[in-house]
C-alpha cells in the first residue's frame, strides 16, 4: 500500500493524480513533513515500513530569495521523517529488518563542473554553492548519520535535472516550452554557457523503484 504525503504548496496539483486516486492500494495524505507529531501518527496508522523521500523545496532562485524555508523543509523536514521512522521501526517486532529510508538528493551538492571532461561520482567532495544545494547537503548528512548512529537502512541517490508532464512551469524545460508557445523571449542564465543533464521522469521513477526494491528486498 502506497501512502503519498504532500503539503501541496504552490507547485503541487492533485489533478495530476486523477488516474490513480481511486486505486485500493493508494492513499493521499495532505500534510507537512515538518509536522513531526503528524508524521509519527501516520507511521503508526499505516504501519509504514519504507520511505521514499522526495519532498523538498527545489528551486535554486527561490532559495536565494528565501533560504529559511529551504532549511526548514529540506533539513528539518528530513530530520522529522528520519526521527519518526526511527521511533516506529526501533520499537517494531522486527526492528530495522526489511525497513528502508530512501532519500533522493541532487547532484547540486557536488558544486559545478569545469569544461574539462571531468564528472562527479558518489565519492566527490560536497561543495554546495546555493542555499538550495546547501540544504540538500545538510539533509544528506542527516540521513547518513542516522545510518551510522542508529543502524537505520538507508539509500541516498543524487539526481540531475528531471523533466516531464505536468512539471511546474518555473522549471527550465516547461518554461521554455510555454514561452515558445506564447511568443515570449527565452531566458538566458549567466552567459548562456551552462550545461545541464536532463532525466525523464518515467526513467527516474523506474530507477527509484528498482533501487528501493533491490535494497529493501521487499
Question: What is each residue range found by the language model?
Answer:
Residues 72, 187-190, 218:
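Short, hydrophobic secondary-structure boundary micro-motifs
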Residues 208-218:
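Residue-level detector of conserved catalytic or cofactor/ligand-binding positions
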Residues 116-118, 169-177:
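A glycine/serine/threonine-rich, flexible loop-to-helix segment
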Residues 60, 185, 194-195:
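Conserved catalytic core of two-component sensor histidine kinases, primarily the HATPase_c ATP-binding
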Residues 177-186, 199-210:
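Alpha-helical substrate-binding/gating segment
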Residues 1-162, 202-210:
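N-terminal Rossmann-like NAD(P)+-binding domain of SDR-like oxidoreductases, especially those catalyzing
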Residues 129, 160-170, 190-201:
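Glycine-rich "substrate-gating" loop/helix at the edge of Rossmann-like oxidoreductase active sites
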Amino acid at each position: 500500500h502506497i501512502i503519498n504525503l504532500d503539503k501541496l504548496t504552490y507547485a503541487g496539483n492533485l489533478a495530476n493524480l486523477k488516474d490513480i486516486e481511486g486505486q485500493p492500494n493508494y492513499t493521499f495524505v495532505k500534510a507537512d513533513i515538518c509536522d513531526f507529531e503528524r508524521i509519527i501518527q501516520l507511521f503508526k496508522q499505516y504501519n509504514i515500513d519504507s520511505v521514499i523521500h522526495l519532498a523538498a523545496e527545489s528551486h535554486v532562485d527561490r532559495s536565494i530569495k528565501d533560504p529559511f524555508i529551504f532549511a526548514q523543509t529540506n533539513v528539518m523536514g528530513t530530520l522529522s521523517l528520519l526521527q519518526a521512522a526511527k521511533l516506529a521501526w526501533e520499537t517494531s517486532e522486527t526492528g530495522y529488518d526489511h525497513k528502508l529510508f530512501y532519500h533522493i538528493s541532487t547532484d547540486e551538492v557536488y558544486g559545478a563542473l569545469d569544461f574539462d571532461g571531468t564528472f562527479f561520482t558518489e565519492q566527490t567532495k560536497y561543495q554546495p554553492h546555493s542555499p538550495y544545494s546547501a540544504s540538500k547537503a545538510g539533509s544528506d548528512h542527516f540521513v547518513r548519520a542516522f545510518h551510522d548512529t542508529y543502524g537505520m537502512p538507508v539509500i541516498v541517490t543524487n539526481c540531475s535535472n528531471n523533466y516531464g508532464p505536468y512539471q511546474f512551469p518555473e522549471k527550465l524545460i516547461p518554461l521554455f516550452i510555454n514561452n515558445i508557445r506564447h511568443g515570449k523571449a527565452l531566458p538566458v542564465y549567466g552567459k548562456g554557457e551552462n550545461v545541464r543533464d536532463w532525466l525523464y521522469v518515467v526513467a527516474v521513477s523506474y530507477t527509484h523503484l528498482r533501487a528501493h526494491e533491490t535494497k529493501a528486498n521487499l
